[in-house]
């Protein structure tokens, strides 16, 4: 009872002292209750946020608002409004929601995803852009993508029941090799892939605005952990440890390899070499070294997460719409022929495959409710005033499923981007906005292309059947925990199209024999969870 009284009194004091903001000029929304605001209007557990907020569009219009403990949350269901607020007004809308839990307690404010817009953010983004943010920069890693996508086919051939794991391993293999020159374990789970996936899971959860009460009531941090409701402290410590290990373990691996002169050229080794040549000695500026480590750590979340979700959606779509797979295979057969797998050099000659990349990003977007921005100043949009400090949340799923923009939007239909329909490219909405657009999007786009093209060329994908031989209809549903979504687990059947395809897949064993994994070279106490 005492704890309840303390919480209520503290909440009231905090609300009256810091969050007594007027609604004048705010976008319309449900009337808030005293003190707690619209807390009852927040998405319930188990309901996808993008679906929950859709009803606000119909009731309150394309730009609406709610507030919790005086904190405004602006809900955007209009593409033009989103691009005005995030692109044209990027000087005022590039902040991130202040996250006491995810930022200060977990430490995720060290990395791009949760950093506030400022000097550190600009330095980090410049580093990433310089290495991977251009077509030429992304193209440097095509050899890695070529090998890892081919190995993905081989894993899928030899062990088709673990396709989802193979998708994650392919994405992790590309990013970790490109970022650190690290080779994943070829035939068993890789501890570094496992570690970074835990980090991404944490980021996905903490970036959801209004997820943790301690973000609104920071004084809860000082309540004894033994009392009810304080379990967030142990969770924060675990995620901080995972983040710190994700930053340090692979970075130290690169330094050790460079000391021996056996490093593979990568994002980290290139930056360290450039700094050494510039400085003429082995002493690194502490700030620059921290920038390298922290930007490297976010690479996986910046590219691999979208790649994994998108490829999983693609596989699901091939079962639900088998005619699409047949049409794509016909294009591959006509353009490439039966004697080789498609490569990056074929992309401009594969318009239908390119459209499949776009449609896979649109159909089940990896971040359907976008990543929240924060208004760093008052923003005026029409007759609305979005006050400084507001959280801005774009419903990306709606932008990509608005029937006024996309014909029959629930259908997976690559033809929508081709003549004569020419529906809008989803690219401008599925990678973020403004100064916070995903810096690894070009690398991720190339990974998605090469995997889709080669799966289409080599495999048939079908619905699974039960023990009685009845077809199992897969569910087209999202996971609901965190900002990052993927299809819920589904049954499937995948098999090589023919004997020639088996030969093409197995050729990688001769062309690129399995590397010995580098896991044993990592500091083991950092990667054992």
UniProtKB/Swiss-Prot annotation:
Keyword Signal: no
Keyword match Glycoprotein: yes
GO MF annotation, one: heme binding
Pathway the protein takes part in: Mycotoxin biosynthesis
Annotated coiled-coil segments of the chain: none
Gene3D superfamilies named in the record: Cytochrome P450
Carbohydrate attachment residues: 244, 281
Top EC category: oxidoreductase
Gene Ontology CC terms, in alphabetical order: membrane
InterPro entries (UniProt xref): Cyt_P450, Cyt_P450_CS, Cyt_P450_E_grp-I, Cyt_P450_sf, Cytochrome_P450_fung
Transmembrane portions of the chain: 2-19
Keyword annotations of the record: Glycoprotein, Heme, Iron, Membrane, Metal-binding, Monooxygenase, Oxidoreductase, Transmembrane, Transmembrane helix, Virulence
Membrane topology, from the record: Single-pass membrane protein
Pfam family, one: p450
Binding-site list for heme: 438
Knockout or disruption consequences: Leads to complete loss of culmorin production. Does not affect the trichothecene biosynthetic pathway since 15-acetyldeoxynivalenol (15ADON) is still produced.
Protein role: Cytochrome P450 monooxygenase involved in the biosynthesis of culmorin, a tricyclic sesquiterpene diol reported to have antifungal activity and some phytotoxicity to wheat coleoptile tissue, contributing to Fusarium head blight disease. The terpene cyclase CLM1 is responsible for the cyclization of farnesyl diphosphate into the intermediate longiborneol.
Name this polypeptide is given: Cytochrome P450 monooxygenase CLM2
Native species: Gibberella zeae (strain ATCC MYA-4620 / CBS 123657 / FGSC 9075 / NRRL 31084 / PH-1)
Record lineage: Eukaryota, Fungi, Dikarya, Ascomycota, Pezizomycotina
